[in-house]
Every structure is written in structure tokens, then in C-alpha cells.
């Protein structure tokens, strides 16, 4: 049996699209919101089964990975987050790069030699890798208009994955993947009602975020706090990415209030120095990510000062 386990953001979805459009197989999909990354523990695979893992930190899935390997499961792992110690096992195939200008969709694009490059470009744009995505688009011969459309698609796909619960999303990531797979091409999906719904939601939420101002500013970083509202939870990721573009010399932390009074945190390193975000977030129990962009799934309110201290140590030194 085949299991496809993937992050519910643009990078994870576009990675799987490339693979399955080239190699269609019946599989069990395992995915969730963008921050739901410990997905391998949900996989009940048996000896001889095959599991494909896309855009999920190996650090957060190592115990489940070791369990699957010990059970005789074959695992293909492709990712761009911090991996830690990679198991040495004959059943494990690994393609991992932690380079800040790489995402999983681009790694898959390399493996497939550009066979589904449009989806790779959309995934990279969604992961806020505008320069690498644009370079791949130019090399592949896409027009400026088509490249702009792929960028908007990638951003909207990524936007859909944010929020602490599936109820906040416009589409369950598995259903969104299904709609994209059925469309086959980005251009076909861009003409669909599903994309119009996603696009309208994105534009409304971005408009609501435009009045926000930072609650804390230091020379090297700024902190923004979003209200406990569905639109804020959905827009937190793209809002963080927009801040990086608007203020490229400083880092940003975007806090979204949760129902229990804690915060969902997105941290973006300065665009001019795409390092340190993972270092900051990994100091907290539910934190992690990559050097350019990381997050904390649940930050207790009493740890806000600790977060500001970690940001100051990393970016004001």
C-alpha cells in the first residue's frame, strides 16, 4: 500500500502534485494544517508498504520514522527543514537540503528534471522564495504574465494552510490537493470556482490586516499581534512574508491569539540575512522550522518576554 504524507501548505501540496502527475498511484493521503507536522505517527503502514514524506521536519517525526523502518516499511523522505540525525537504514531514501533558497517542491522538480515545473514554481512562490521561483520560471520559458499567475496561485495555496485548526481553512488540504490534481495544470485550476473562492478569501483577509501596527519594535526586529479571529489565523503566514518584503533588514514575529490565551507564532528572519528563525523558535517546546522561517505552535502568554529576549539575542547582537 502507498501512503502519501505531506504538509498542507503550498510546498507540500505542489510537491505531491508533481510526483503523482508523473507517477499516478492509488494512495492514502495523510495531511493537515501547515503547523500539523508530526504526521508520520498517523501512518499505520505494514511490512512491504511504501510511504512518501514531503515537506515535514524529520526532527518532529523521527520516532514514528524509526518505528516504520523497523516494521519493514519503505520510506522516501524529501524535505528542506532541519533534519537532525538521519537514520542509516536500507529502507530509507532521503533527499534533504536545508539551504535557505530551497524548498521541497524545488527538490522534487530536480528529481523529475522539470517534468511538472509549473507546480514547482507555484510551490516555491508559496514558500516565499520569490527569487528562486522566478529564476526557474525564466529558465523554463514562462512569460511574465504566467509567472505572475503562478505566484498568486502559490501564495493562495499557502494561505489556505494556516490556522490552528482545519475549521479555519477554506479547504481541507487533502480536498484542495484533489481539486488541483483533477485540474492537472495551474492554468486550469486558476479558471475554477475553487480558486476564485480561495482568491477572494485571501484578498479579504489581507485587507483586514493592513491596519495592523507592531506592538514591540527594536532595531533588529518587530513583533505584531493579531486578534483571535479566523481571518487573522488564516492570514498570519502571508502577513509575515509580506513584512519581510516590506522591511528586509529586520526580523518579524507575528503572534496570533488562540482560544486558550496562548499564541500561535510565525517568525521570519530578515530577508537580507535569512538565518536565525529556527534558532529562536526551537528554544520553545512547540517550536521549530527552518533558518529563514519558523514558528511556535503554542506559546504561553507568560513566555512572551522570553520570546522577545530570544529575538533580541539573535537579531540585535
Task: Identify what each model region corresponds to.
Residues 98-99, 178-225:
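Oxyanion-binding "anion nests"
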Residues 104, 172-176, 194, 198-205, ...:
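Alpha-helical structural motif
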Residues 133, 137-184:
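Loop-centered beta-sheet repeat module
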Residues 58, 159-171, 192-204, 234-241:
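Short N-terminal helix-initiation segments at or just after the protein's N-terminus
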Amino acid at each position: 500500500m502507498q501512503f502519501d504524507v505531506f504538509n498542507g501548505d503550498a510546498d507540500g501540496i505542489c510537491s505531491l502534485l508533481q510526483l503523482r502527475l508523473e507517477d499516478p498511484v492509488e494512495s492514502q493521503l495523510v495531511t493537515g494544517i501547515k503547523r500539523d507536522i508530526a504526521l508520520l505517527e498517523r501512518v499505520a503502514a505494514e511490512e512491504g508498504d511504501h510511504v512518501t514524506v514531503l515537506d515535514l521536519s524529520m526532527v518532529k517525526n523521527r520516532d514514528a520514522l524509526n518505528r516504520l523502518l523497523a516494521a519493514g516499511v519503505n520510506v522516501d523522505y524529501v524535505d528542506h527543514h532541519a533534519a537532525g540525525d538521519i537514520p542509516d537504514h536500507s529502507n530509507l531514501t532521503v533527499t534533504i537540503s536545508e539551504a535557505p533558497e530551497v524548498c521541497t517542491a524545488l527538490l522534487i522538480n530536480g528529481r523529475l528534471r522539470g517534468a511538472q515545473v509549473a507546480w514547482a514554481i507555484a510551490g516555491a512562490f508559496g514558500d516565499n522564495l520569490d527569487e528562486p521561483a522566478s529564476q526557474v520560471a525564466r529558465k523554463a520559458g514562462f512569460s511574465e504574465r504566467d509567472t505572475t499567475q503562478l505566484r498568486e496561485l502559490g501564495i493562495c495555496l499557502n494561505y489556505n494552510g494556516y490556522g490552528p485548526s482545519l475549521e479555519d481553512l477554506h479547504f481541507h488540504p487533502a480536498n484542495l490537493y484533489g481539486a488541483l490534481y483533477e485540474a492537472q495544470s495551474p492554468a486550469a485550476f486558476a479558471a475554477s470556482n475553487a480558486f476564485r473562492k480561495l482568491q477572494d478569501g485571501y484578498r479579504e483577509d489581507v485587507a483586514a490586516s493592513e491596519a495592523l501596527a507592531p506592538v514591540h519594535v527594536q532595531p533588529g526586529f518587530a513583533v505584531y499581534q493579531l486578534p483571535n479571529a479566523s481571518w487573522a489565523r488564516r492570514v498570519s503566514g502571508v502577513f509575515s512574508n509580506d513584512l519581510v518584503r516590506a522591511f528586509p533588514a529586520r526580523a518579524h514575529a507575528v503572534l496570533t491569539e488562540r482560544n486558550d490565551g496562548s499564541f500561535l507564532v510565525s517568525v521570519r528572519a530578515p530577508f537580507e540575512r535569512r538565518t536565525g528563525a529556527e534558532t529562536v523558535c526551537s528554544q520553545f517546546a512547540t517550536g521549530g522550522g527552518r533558518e529563514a522561517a519558523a514558528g511556535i505552535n503554542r506559546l504561553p502568554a507568560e513566555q512572551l518576554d522570553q520570546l522577545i529576549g530570544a529575538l533580541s539575542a539573535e537579531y540585535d547582537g
